[in-house]
Amino acid sequence: MSFHKEDGVNSLCQKALHIVTELCFAGQVEWEKCSGIFPRDRGSQGGSSTDISVSLLAVVVSFCGLALLVVSLFVFWKLCWPCWKSKPVTSNITTLPQSISSAPTEVFETEEKKEIKENEKPAVKAIEPAIKISHTSPDIPAEVQTALKEHLIKHARVQRQITEPTSSTRHSSFRRHLPRQMQVSSVDFSMGTEPVLQRGETTTSIGRIKPELYKQKSVDSEGNQNEDVKICGKLNFTLQYDYENELLVVKIIKALDLPAKDFTGTSDPYVKMYLLPDRKKKFQTRVHRKTLNPLFDETFQFPVAYDQLSNRKLHFSVYDFDRFSRHDMIGEVILDNLFEVSDLSREATVWKDIHCATTESIDLGEIMFSLCYLPTAGRMTLTVIKCRNLKAMDITGSSDPYVKVSLMCEGRRLKKRKTTTKKNTLNPVYNEAIIFDIPPENVDQVSLSIAVMDYDRVGHNEVIGVCRTGLDAEGLGRDHWNEMLAYHRKPITHWHPLLELPGRATSFDSQGSCPSPKPPSTP
């Protein structure tokens, strides 16, 4: 009986517990009343809330870490990206000398310590890394890289110094600053010397200045003439410019050691002075009787603007006065550069040698013309291009120039042609061609006489100056003719100085025997 009673009580207890559980979890009874009945469920409920808070904390920490990582990446990109971005740009812009020299510098700095410890090792190992690094530069041509590598390997031992072995590679790296156009194989990399071009100079010397190409014949000829000119005394004068009144003040002080022109062994000297190219304004000193060392002490003034002084020349002519005949010229002094001594702001004293001369050398101007000869047609063309700085022949300070060309043979004038007249100018431009028929067999027998004339409506036309060209001419006239014969069918152009007419009979109107040129054979 007792056994059945216990079973009934247990079943009732289980049913009661089941009912209480349903009521507590259904929410119909306050949880505080049920907490004493279900202690384990309370602990599990607290554990579940703890698990939820831990998971939330883990989520927050993960989010903060991710945000910190993003910020770190952003800062790293801002700091390092400009450097990486600039590397390809600078490598493309850098020229060949920079691309070659930048790589070996780092390599040689690391190799210095090795060379101090191991002096017996060849320098080729230190050079090869530099060459390999330079291969990465896109600006270096493959041919230059190959030539540079071969030459550096060949001259590796030469680059060492006995006293300072560590500096040899460093200096050799600087010597590789070569232009792109220069041939590397033609440069000497030896220490202590500058690169010297050898056989490759002819193909790589583009852009180099060769002074011998700029030598002018006129300068050389003037130097030779100055060596042959005889000195006949010295002239002392002073120069100063008056800025307020725009005047060039010239004071002729004295002359020394003049030659004797009279039979008594003395002279009666005086000085005439021009400021070229203007000959209208002329000054003359007093005549000093019977002396070879006259003391003039006279001052003259030329009205001229300061900015025009660079284009002016001061011309002194020393004469011997003769009462009964023509005055004899002793010599002359020409000061080409007025700023030779100073800027003329203060009085400058000048001593010049007097060059002996029998006639006064006058700057008559220059003429430019071209010569062209066609041997097959037997035709010579002289093109008068222009003149410059002609002598003023009219009282107005200008001229009416034209050019007359005469075909001469042994002093006889065969034909003559002339250009049009240009009015009131000292720098006429013509561009007119004059043609003469000259067979090839007669070219060596003829010459051309060119005279610049001043047209005068009332009186006779005056000769300003003349020049000649031909095999029998002198200086530039002969050279111009020979150059024309050497280069057929090609116009040869030169400037020619105009000279004074030595005599009408010898230049234009003299008669002589000369075979007339045969007409060119017609095919």
From Swiss-Prot:
Keywords: Calcium, Cytoplasmic vesicle, Disulfide bond, Exocytosis, Membrane, Metal-binding, Phosphoprotein, Repeat, Transmembrane, Transmembrane helix. Binds 3 Ca(2+) ions per subunit. The ions are bound to the C2 domains. The chain crosses the membrane at residues 56-76. CDD domains: C2A_Synaptotagmin-1-5-6-9-10, C2B_Synaptotagmin-3-5-6-9-10. PROSITE patterns: C2. Residues 231-352, 363-496 form the C2 domain. Residues 1-55 are vesicular. GO terms for biological process: chemical synaptic transmission; exocytosis; positive regulation of calcium ion-dependent exocytosis; regulation of calcium ion-dependent exocytosis; sensory perception of smell; vesicle-mediated transport. Residues 77-523 are cytoplasmic. It is a single-pass membrane protein. Ca(2+) 1 binds at residues 262, 268, 320-322. Disulfide bonds: none annotated. Ca(2+) 4 binds at residues 394, 400, 454, 456. Its main location: membrane. It is found in: Cytoplasmic vesicle, Secretory vesicle membrane. One of its GO terms (cellular component) is presynapse. Ca(2+) 3 binds at residues 322, 325, 328. InterPro entries: C2_dom (IPR000008), C2_domain_sf (IPR035892), Synaptotagmin (IPR001565). GO terms for molecular function: calcium ion binding; calcium ion sensor activity; calcium-dependent phospholipid binding; phosphatidylinositol-4,5-bisphosphate binding; phosphatidylserine binding; protein heterodimerization activity; protein homodimerization activity; SNARE binding. Gene3D superfamilies: C2 domain. The modification Phosphothreonine is found at residue 136. Ca(2+) sensor specifically required for the Ca(2+)-dependent exocytosis of secretory vesicles containing IGF1 in neurons of the olfactory bulb. Exocytosis of IGF1 is required for sensory perception of smell. Not involved in Ca(2+)-dependent synaptic vesicle exocytosis. Acts through Ca(2+) and phospholipid binding to the C2 domain: Ca(2+) induces binding of the C2-domains to phospholipid membranes and to assembled SNARE-complexes; both actions contribute to triggering exocytosis. Belongs to the synaptotagmin family. The cysteine motif mediates homo- or heterodimer formation via formation of disulfide bonds. Homodimer; disulfide-linked via the cysteine motif. Can also form heterodimers with SYT3, SYT6, SYT7 and SYT9. This is Synaptotagmin-10. It comes from Homo sapiens. The lineage of its organism: Eukaryota, Metazoa, Chordata, Craniata, Vertebrata.
